[in-house]
């Protein structure tokens, strides 16, 4: 596993939970002897939904809601078998989506 790299992408609606999860992953990887690059903040994805306030007419009266998806990227360079094992056992909050590429 000498020249391999693990790329972890984290997504969440709440940036505080996302940053805590990223810190847990970085701390766990460093403790097991791997070199870590990140967490790198990626652009926040903003989705806006516009709805009419009234049911029948008054099209000028609208309301907008937005959903922000925050993202972070972590690269683990030269992971050891102990690193992979400790990352598999790591417990993260349910609001964080994790994508792992080897």
From Swiss-Prot:
Top-level taxonomic group: Bacteria
HAMAP family named in the record: Ribosomal_uS10
PANTHER family: 30S RIBOSOMAL PROTEIN S10 FAMILY MEMBER
Role summary: Involved in the binding of tRNA to the ribosomes.
Organism: Bacillus mycoides (strain KBAB4) (Bacillus weihenstephanensis)
Gene Ontology biological-process annotations: translation
Gene Ontology CC: ribonucleoprotein complex; ribosome
Keywords assigned by UniProt, alphabetized: Ribonucleoprotein, Ribosomal protein
GO function terms (MF aspect): structural constituent of ribosome; tRNA binding
KW Ribosomal protein (keyword) present: yes
Gene3D superfamilies from the UniProt entry: Ribosomal protein S10 domain (3.30.70.600)
Subunit structure as annotated in this protein's UniProt entry: Part of the 30S ribosomal subunit.
KW Ribonucleoprotein (keyword) present: yes
SUPFAM superfamilies named in the record: Ribosomal protein S10 (SSF54999)
UniProt record similarity statement: Belongs to the universal ribosomal protein uS10 family.
Protein name (database record): Small ribosomal subunit protein uS10
InterPro entries given in the database record: Ribosomal_uS10, Ribosomal_uS10_CS, Ribosomal_uS10_dom, Ribosomal_uS10_dom_sf
Gene: rpsJ
């Amino acid at each position: 596993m000498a020249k391999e790299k693990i790329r972890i992408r984290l997504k969440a609606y709440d940036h505080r939970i996302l940053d805590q999860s990223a810190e847990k992953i970085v701390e766990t990887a460093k403790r097991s002897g791997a070199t870590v690059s990140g967490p790198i903040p990626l652009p926040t994805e903003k989705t806006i939904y516009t709805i009419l306030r009234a049911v029948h007419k008054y099209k000028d009266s609208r309301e907008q809601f937005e959903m922000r998806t925050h993202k972070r990227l972590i690269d683990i360079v030269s992971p050891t078998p102990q690193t992979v094992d400790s990352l598999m056992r790591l417990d993260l909050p349910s609001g964080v989506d994790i994508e792992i590429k080897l």
